[in-house]
Amino acid sequence: MGTALVTGATSGIGLELAWQLAEAHHDLVLVARTRERLERVATQISQFAGVGVQVIAADLSIPDDVARVADRLRVGSPAPGVPVGAAGAEGAADAPHTAAQVAARPIDLLVNDAGFAVGQPFATGDIAQERRALNVMVGAVLELTHAAVPGMVARGHGAILNVSSVTALTAMGTYAAHKAWVRTFTEGLASELRGTGVTATVLNPGLTRSEFHDRAGMDADWPDMAWLRAEDVARAALAAVRRGQVICTPSLRYLGVNALLRIAPRGVVRRVAGHASVRTRY
């Protein structure tokens, strides 16, 4: 049984990842802004999956909150552990760890999922909102990964799962820019970690049914065939982590989109992205 820390853990892909990790007998550290929702999710997961859950209410746009989560990632002495994804048979039989016990365990898997759509034109938008998005989707990913990796390397095992997007290859405003950074950063990290027993995986989902897209006003703008289910995305992501796969793009249709974006002239990509940005209220 390992321990996973998941940011953005109360909705969408992050919530589904938390559930699937719990079903594989991983203890959890759940991070999100709203304590009430965190406590509710933690209770549900602990009761139904029989694992220990610690919660950390943190706004990852605030440096002090990021520092608290980073401190949690540094917990644990260098000692051999169970590889990520290897659920021990004893996990289901043992009594769940308490939140205090979970808080003392080293983190085997860090999932950087927290993020949000800015939903405004850059030129006329609120710069404070842009800064907040940058802090959450770039700054926090950088800081939390930097906090987690040394201990994982010292223990000889661990994994980082960073959530990017197929929009990383488009030109859809600052959101796409943030996700492009996540993708490039994770690929570089994976190369750096080769041979250490620690892996880095970047998840590039397409449109996925969640509160994220509801808040961005995107739900009604795309046909049903364009949407993925969060449970399918999470399942593909965790399978990729267990294989040590660096890039995970769930579904054949988005693999095709990804390939087209890579070979299409950038001028064409910009025109298509500009049209999509208008439709999705960026």
Where are these regions (language model features)?
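Conserved glycine-rich Rossmann-like NAD(P)H-binding loop of the short-chain dehydrogenase/reductase
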Residues: 25-40
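SDR active-site lid
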Residues: 190-256, 267
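Substrate-binding pocket helix/loop in short-chain dehydrogenase/reductase
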Residues: 121-123, 129-134
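Residue(s) in the substrate-gating loop at a strand-loop-helix junction
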Residues: 165
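Active-site helix of classical SDR
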Residues: 145, 178
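Conserved NAD(P)H cofactor-binding loop of Rossmann-fold oxidoreductase domains
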Residues: 113-118
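Conserved glycine-rich cofactor-binding loop
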Residues: 10-12
